[in-house]
Amino acid sequence: MKTFTAKPETVKRDWYVVDADGKTLGRLATEIARRLRGKHKAEYTPHVDTGDYIIVLNAEKVAVTGHKRTDKVYYRHTGHVGGIKQATFEEMIARSPERVIEIAVKGMLPKGPLGRAMYRKLKVYAGAEHNHAAQQPQVLDI
């Protein structure tokens, strides 16, 4: 018997919608990353993108535990000398709530071309509306 290897052209990808309202950021991000990679499927193959599309709604209502709302700091660099910028979790949620979930999930995906392809299947929205009704996404309860 030969070992099964998934082929990119035969992978069936489903669309799922997840409501982030009241969910803990890290626990939500790990399950999203797992499904983007395709590890929940029997035909998972490490070197093939077998994951599904994930739509995340209500990113502005995601929860964190402890004092992370005020103490957690996100760093980024402009590329210029002395150009390090920082923002707390509260500031990030106020400015662009989608980025909080995107950063958390991206850090859990593989680094490289395959990881970037998986990341492109993540769609995050601050509110409860999305424009992917044509894909008929199924509700995923995490």
Swiss-Prot record:
One of its GO terms (molecular function) is mRNA binding. It comes from the Bacteria. Keywords: Ribonucleoprotein, Ribosomal protein. The keyword Nuclease does not apply. GO terms for cellular component: cytosolic large ribosomal subunit. Coiled coil: none annotated. InterPro entries: Ribosomal_uL13, Ribosomal_uL13_bac-type, Ribosomal_uL13_CS, Ribosomal_uL13_sf. The keyword Ribonucleoprotein applies. One of its GO terms (biological process) is translation. Belongs to the universal ribosomal protein uL13 family. Part of the 50S ribosomal subunit. This protein is one of the early assembly proteins of the 50S ribosomal subunit, although it is not seen to bind rRNA by itself. It is important during the early stages of 50S assembly. This is Large ribosomal subunit protein uL13. It comes from Proteus mirabilis (strain HI4320).
